Amino acid sequence: SFVIARMPINKAKYLTDYTYNYEYNLVFGGESYPMGENVYSIPNSWIVDAVNLSVESEFKWIVTAPSLDKGWTYCGKVDSDATRYGKSVRRKTLSTTSNGKKILKDTNNSTLDFTPEVKPSLMN
């Protein structure tokens, strides 16, 4: 998932106060492997917008709160398929104002709001 957030604090405070460590055991083939990492969190209240992404054939679950995004979209249909590169998702346009400003669709559901597998706009 990707988010756009407004950070109401400075960088130093964020890096100090919003870090956490997670740990779990990856169990595979009868073996258990301890896993973990130090990461940073972004409170949902700071998030302006979110999009959940997956390769279509590999989608498992939505990792954001439903208030942020109730759906998901994709840039490739099959993992490890070289044709999935050079693609993007693009938010759908509802309308365009008289001065040319696009009004974008935003229902907090990426399945409905984005067109998958489009050519990135900077490549046009």
Residue ranges and their predicted role:
Residues 1-124:
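Intrinsically disordered, low-complexity linkers and terminal tails enriched in Ser/Thr/Pro/Gly
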